[in-house]
Amino acid sequence: MKFTELTVTEFDNFVQNPSLESHYFQVKENIVTRENDGFEVVLLGIKDDNNKVIAASLFSKIPTMGSYVYYSNRGPVMDFSDLGLVDYYLKELDKYLQQHQCLYVKLDPYWLYHLYDKDIVPFEGREKNDALVNLFKSHGYEHHGFTTEYDTSSQVRWMGVLNLEGKTPETLKKTFDSQRKRNINKAINYGVKVRFLERDEFNLFLDLYRETEERAGFVSKTDDYFYNFIDTYGDKVLVPLAYIDLDEYVLKLQQELNDKENRRDQMMAKENKSDKQMKKIAELDKQIDHDQHELLNASELSKTDGPILNLASGVYFANAYEVNYFSGGSSEKYNQFMGPYMMHWFMINYCFDNGYDRYNFYGLSGDFTENSEDYGVYRFKRGFNVQIEELIGDFYKPIHKVKYWLFTTLDKLRKKLKK
């Protein structure tokens, strides 16, 4: 085996293997994204004795104190169950970094530590991947810890994932809780549609994202941040928009209302109606009243807000391994149409239609108590019967130890002065 720099083609061909469980940050498109952010990129990996790539990683070189911080965001990519391969990689990476002006290195691999069901009960027969964590530590890496909160300096360590293997949309939907099934069906009955946005329509996503940002108070990404991905990832970025055409909805309601009124009139015209028939008439009267109310509201809403209402939108990344929900927004004013539910249901079906076995709802804090900052997010994802995946976390290693000590000392001093 040999540790070496890789060409873009070598790197790209390797990470296309879905069995390697790679992240969308470890794809060739991210090279340009990082370069647009002002960073150099280097592709490092291992080749076997037949010159076949068996490990790869995309590193950003971040200039710091006359040296570089080497950061492989969600890398490296390899068969992490092969501890011998991981051991060799870490040993040879250290040698490389010693010769290439590295201050310190950060790795946050997309590697599983433990697996749980939706109720945080460990899967039977699964063990925590402590061997992998201990291997990093044996090479001088500091583990950032088994965190259970969001950290702006780190990628998420917990995820909610739908495993689609061996399932169909119908069998999967049966595993959802009653609220998820009910709200998806509501959206379908409303006639909510979903389409993919083009780049020149991306402002429609941003409008919903900014509204949600203001409502929820979360730390958001800039417009340029999103456009950087849109422009470099191409068809690996998917931006669905859930919307409703009120004109179509009003027409559908009117047709259903006419049908119910005709049925009610026909039943009323019969003489000597039984108790059972009278109950059916009473039920139809309730449905007619409801439909008339809905028809009036939809007609008024169309007049004031226009016939097309944008309900929810999201940014997704698709790679060889999965479809990953990155970020999203929705309109609170139109939440009765259940736009987010329809968007997720549409994208889950997209996975089935395009051969993906994983639909990743992505981030969770790891604190699953009712007082946690994202308990509502967890409950939403839990309702889809997700499996909870815990990743191994962040690892740091100083390479230029004297300069790293100075760097951390100055950083602590700056933080004290800010207080």
From Swiss-Prot:
One of its GO terms (cellular component) is cytoplasm. One of its GO terms (biological process) is cell wall organization. Keywords: Acyltransferase, Antibiotic resistance, Cell shape, Cell wall biogenesis/degradation, Cytoplasm, Peptidoglycan synthesis, Transferase. One of its GO terms (molecular function) is aminoacyltransferase activity. Pfam families: FemAB. Coiled coil: none annotated. InterPro entries: Acyl_CoA_acyltransferase, FEMABX, PG_Glycine_Bridge_Synth. It comes from the Bacteria. Homodimer. Interacts with FemA. Since cross-linking between the peptide strands is critical for maintaining stability of the cell wall, FemB is a potential target for the development of new antibacterial agents. Belongs to the FemABX family. This is Aminoacyltransferase FemB.
